[in-house]
A protein has these predicted regions:
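Conserved beta-ketoacyl condensing-enzyme motif
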Residues: 23-113, 118-136, 191-214, 287-288, ...
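Active-site pocket-lining segment
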Residues: 190, 277-346
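Active-site-proximal alpha-helical scaffold in enzymes
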Residues: 87-118, 157-187, 256-263, 328, ...
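Short, well-ordered amphipathic alpha-helical segments that serve as non-catalytic structural scaffolds
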Residues: 27-43, 68-72, 97, 149-156, ...
């Protein structure tokens, strides 16, 4: 069986949605600019030798429809030769694409694939424009199939006894870690600069242009403290504990990896940065979807022949503070190695992009810590009751 290596990995900064810095950029453009930047960093690679572009997207409609992956390939690679396919596993979509690319290369079906994800929550609302539940299913008592994520978070908080105080403290720490990471420049190497050219009409009906470059995640809040977080009202239940402050931020962003067979890596004399060791998904009750990693992580560890003591760093998607804490508690995870530079509560959660974004952050942090030949874990809960987890080995 072939070995598949990740050669390059980049992401955009994450913009707030719906009124953040990336709201004027279409998702196909955002992703195309990201892969163009990444591929241009590898002059030895003939773009026509890329077999496919696999793009994760959680809401593939409107500006994200029409098989956005193929459009991204055409726009970003400037060639007709490279195909594209769009993948949807909600919040795990970006990680799923890396697993798909790895599997195809290991099997010999491909030699070189771009894999990642993109999401514009500024342009496409959560769940899409017109979700239509099956009311026969609802009438049979399965309404949790269609629950909003906030309701599932409240269910997790209640079932796993996660207090409001602990949720707010977790959220505060997420912001503090992210702010510290930004000040230290720990994200700088992984972020693709995105130029925005925005034309608008001012209050005097004059046509104006606004130009700027996005290079920094918008989410981390300098003035956040536990007192501020404690004063926020519950969003999903009057007597609940889940607030806007202890939930992930709606966001815009893109992240991509370039994955190659070992033979192609050697031919082009390139240096790999990581390889996906294994990947697993698992199902849980939709009403407590946030607990998904509790089933997915043991599964991927078993498939890899590893245990938690073998894992040096963990990127756990912070969909909500309550579900993150429940996962940490249930799995007995070491908090010191989880989201060392903050998570989705502070940095944002651009749905279909997130799995790839967390992978990019993991590789870069493992490089900075010289964790050569060590293992890292990316995991997240997934809507409608799923969990996903991928284990990577940092290679030097």
């Amino acid at each position: 069986m072939n070995t598949a290596y990740i050669i390059s990995a980049y992401r955009t900064a994450v913009g707030k949605a719906p009124r953040g810095l990336l709201r004027f950029k279409r998702p196909d453009e955002l992703a195309a600019e990201t892969i163009e930047y990444m591929v241009n960093k590898i002059p030895a690679l003939d773009k026509s030798r890329i077999d496919d572009v696999i793009v994760g997207n959680a809401t593939p409609e409107a500006e994200q429809g029409l098989n956005i992956a193929r459009l991204i390939s055409l726009m970003g690679l400037k060639t007709d030769d490279v195909a594209g396919v769009t993948v949807n596993r909600y919040c795990a979509s970006g990680l799923e694409t890396i697993a798909m690319a790895t599997a195809k290369i290991k099997s010999g079906m491909s030699n070189c694939i771009i894999a990642g994800g993109v999401e514009s929550m500024s342009l496409i609302p959560m769940g899409g424009y017109k979700p239509i539940p099956d009311y026969k299913i609802v009438s049979q008592g399965k309404e949790d199939y269609y629950w909003g994520m906030g309701l599932t978070a409240e269910a997790v908080a209640k079932q796993y006894n996660i207090s409001r105080e602990d949720q707010d403290k977790f959220s505060y720490n997420s912001h503090m870690k992210a702010l510290k990471a930004q000040k230290e420049g720990r994200f700088d190497d992984q972020i693709v600069p995105i130029d925005i050219n925005h034309t608008y009409v001012d209050e005097k009906n004059n046509k104006c242009k606004n130009k700027y470059t996005v290079t920094k995640d918008e989410g981390p809040r300098e003035g956040t403290n536990t007192d501020v977080l404690n004063k926020l009202r519950p969003v999903f239940s009057k007597k609940g504990t889940v607030t806007a402050g202890n939930s992930s931020q709606m966001s815009d962003g893109a992240a991509f990896t370039l994955i190659m067979s070992e033979a192609m890596v050697n031919e082009l004399n390139l240096k790999p940065i990581a390889r996906m060791v294994n990947y697993a998904v698992a199902g849980v009750e939709p009403r407590i979807m946030g607990i998904g990693p509790v089933k997915a992580v043991p599964k991927v560890l078993k498939q890899s022949g590893l245990n938690l003591n073998d894992i040096s760093l963990i990127e756990l998607n912070e969909a909500f503070a309550c579900q993150s804490l429940a996962v940490i508690n249930e799995l007995g995870l070491d908090k010191e190695i989880i989201n060392v530079n903050g998570g989705a509560i502070s940095l944002g959660h651009p749905l279909g992009c997130t799995g790839a974004k967390l992978s990019v952050q993991l590789f870069d942090e493992m490089r900075k810590r010289s964790l050569n030949n060590k293992y890292g874990l990316v995991t997240m809960c997934v809507g409608t009751g799923q969990g996903a987890a991928g284990i990577f080995e940092f290679v030097k």
